[in-house]
Amino acid sequence: MLISKHEERVKSILSARMENGNLRSRENTQVEFKQSFNKGNIAIYAKTMAAFSNNSGGYIIFGIKDSPRSIIGLQNSNFENIQQEDLTDSINNLFSPSINWELGSFILKEKEINSNGDVIIVQKIIGWIYTEESNIKPVIAQKNNSSEKIVNGDIFYRYRARTEKIKYAEMEQIINCRMKQERDSLFKVFEFIRNNGATNLGIVDYNNGKLSTPYGVDVVLEKNLIAKLLKKAKFIKEGSFSENEGIPVIKVTGNINLAEEVPVPLENLDETYPYIQKQLAEKLNITPQKLYALIWYFKMKESKKYHLEITTSKTNKTHKFSKFALLFLKEKIIELDENKNELNNIISKFNNRKK
């Protein structure tokens, strides 16, 4: 069975032992130990992941007891039953831009001495979440969470074995690094234009998913599709236009599920975006006020998959919503019906957003 590089790294961290079997490894800028995984502690994990993301990435390793640091393994199936989409939604509701992460688990075989003095082999389940270093720093809290003392606008950073609010020196470093990245990106664009000519170029705007071409045909792609493409596709260097000069010829391969990530055609707007807000509320059998709150909370107007603003005159605009928007809201309403307090909180935040 193929072992991922992250599993290998976690096993390496856990391999350093003292004579009594306790872990020699300590928590540091890239490692956090947790005894168990609890769905009610998502904010705790998200805060640590945001801190890792703002530094150089890192691992949360589950199944490790503190004081003394020893491997006990996970005692229930909470970690194995994680719904990754739900966890992603919970994390990205708290922090922005999106945090990229992976998780996994494995069985660690440990030698132990039982009550009879016999050496036995015990299987212990270890879980891990790896957080990538963010390409777009800083990752910022966009929502309050009183239990973890998270306030909208907070920036967390990983310092040695602690997650803390970022200090001046590290914030200055992030700002300088981002400015350098933008300068380097501009230089690359200018160099590419100089070598290839502006008339041959197309531009992808990752913020709105718009692909502009030199042929007068623009295509809008859902941002999640672009993210999945960049994450899942494998870029394989297979030669170049010239053996001695020129840019490499890249073949793009990958197995990407496009079931719900189909680019939205703009030719027939009434068919693609059939609902105004009043019609959408009627379809969902909810009040317009509740609909406005849900649209605001889930930021649906920011995605062309769900929403399109149409100018009808010099002073008037209308908001149209897609069939994807109807399906998305139906699912969310079913979820919120099971948690009335959450729905009331959404409506309350919407009503107080400008106060």
Swiss-Prot record:
Q: Does the keyword ATP-binding apply?
A: yes
**Where is ATP annotated to bind?**
58-65
Q: Which GO terms describe its molecular function?
A: ATP binding
Q: Where is the signal peptide?
A: none
| Database matches in Pfam families | SLFN_AlbA_2 (PF04326)
Which keywords describe this protein according to UniProt?
Answer: ATP-binding, Nucleotide-binding
PANTHER family named among the record's database cross-references:
GLPR-RELATED TRANSCRIPTIONAL REPRESSOR, SCHLAFEN ALBA-2 DOMAIN-CONTAINING PROTEIN
Can you say what this protein is called?
Uncharacterized ATP-binding protein UU034
